[in-house]
Amino acid sequence: MNQFILLTILLVTVVTVSAQDDLNAYREEYKKDFLSDPRAPLKEADLQYLDFFPELPKAVITAEFQLTPAEQPFEMPTYSGVTRTYRKWGIASFTWGPFSSNLVLYENMTNKSNPLYKDYLFLPFKDNTNGETTYGGGRYLNMSKADTEDGKITIDFNKAYNPWCAYSDGFNCPIPPLDNKLPYAIEAGEKMYKGEHKKVKNEK
């Protein structure tokens, strides 16, 4: 029995360390993406001001997923006042403590014909950390259509990130729809930016 308990503890430790390593690698890649995109609001000197919650294992959720093929494209407003064309792709349903929750995943209709982004799904959301420990305008998650197979989807809030509007003016960041407002705090993913908010030329 003692050997079984020891092996179980070792296995859990290995899995936990592996998950943390994966998340650290993901966040390093996330930072590098700012440097490879000339439109990005952050430069190398700014990356030190990015801040993240520690990994939260319970923030990795397996949700039920239902496609919404009858939904028509609509104009999603952004914080700059322009709109972006999206379509509801499906609904993820899960529990968080005592709460039963739904989040809508969206397909970007502008990028649909681009082979690099045709499988991309967008999950904007708000929660009770906004304006306290995270950006007031909500956060985003990137998903793939392949993630929605077999009627389930894994949502990892540890990978939640800020819209570029969190760092600078001049960007057209979609406003998370009311359907995606969670009535509790998700203390996982990216926190509020610690650097100075910038002003840049409006994106096109």
Language model regions located:
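Start-of-domain marker
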Residues: 20-73
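Mid-length scaffold segments of soluble, non-membrane domains
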Residues: 76-137
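A mature extracytoplasmic/lumenal domain signature
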Residues: 65, 105-107, 127-129, 157-161, ...
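Short, surface-exposed linear segments at secondary-structure transitions and domain or protein termini
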Residues: 110-118, 143-152, 194
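Acidic, glycine-rich flexible loop segments
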Residues: 122-163
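Bacterial Sec-dependent N-terminal signal peptides
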Residues: 1-22
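Extracellular/lumen-exposed scaffold segments
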Residues: 21, 44-47, 52, 72-88, ...
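Extended, aromatic/histidine-rich regions of cofactor-dependent oxidoreductases associated
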Residues: 161-204
